[in-house]
Amino acid sequence: LERLQYLNLAQNQLTGHIPSELGKLNIYRLNLEFNQLTGNIPEELGSLTELVHLNLESNQLRGKIPVSLSKLKRLKKLELQNNQLIGKLPEIISGWKVLEELNLSNNKLTGLIPEILGRQDSLKVLNLSFNYLDGDIPINLLQNENLELLYLHVNNLQGIIPETVCWRENPIKLLFYSNGFCPPYPECIKYIGKQICGN
């Protein structure tokens, strides 16, 4: 397996835990999506330092996102959606300097959206929908001109969406429905959806 660069075992009805031995490979892409894998994401995956794309979407993975993944300095795309991951969004995000797409939707993540996400200049797509995130949206995230898509719908977010989101030079696709944002809403947001405002 020394010459293996891309491991794709998607949609194979695989069960059990993700083998920690995968961390010994020298691959740039790992795709295990749409299986029935359980347990935690192995810390050993942090040893895949050449990894550009990690896709563990649509399994039954539990636990927290391991801190070891901060070692994946070349990571451009991380897809962990449709699992049962818990905990807060980790500060290890700061280690992903070239990350372009991050999808953590449909998990059980809690806590605040870290401001570090707004300083990820490479980030183009961020999907945190269908979790239990609360607090405000970091202003610097809305002002990130490289961000093209921001999905935060169906969380427990609250506060006021700042008008500065309308001052962007580059367009962005936003979905905020089913949160607790209070009016007034920025004029440039055409669809805010149902909100449960605490005021």
Regions of interest found by a model, annotated:
Residues 7-9, 28-32, 52-56, 75-80, ...:
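Conserved hydrophobic beta-strand positions in leucine-rich repeat
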Residues 15-20, 41-43, 65-67, 89-91, ...:
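The feature encodes a structural signal of leucine-rich repeats
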Residues 12, 35, 56-59, 80-83, ...:
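Consensus "Asn ladder" position of solenoid repeat domains
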Residues 142-199:
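Leucine-rich solenoid repeat scaffolds
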Residues 1-13, 182:
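Short intrinsically disordered, low-complexity coil segments enriched in acidic
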Residues 1-4, 23-27, 46-51, 70-75, ...:
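Leucine-rich repeat
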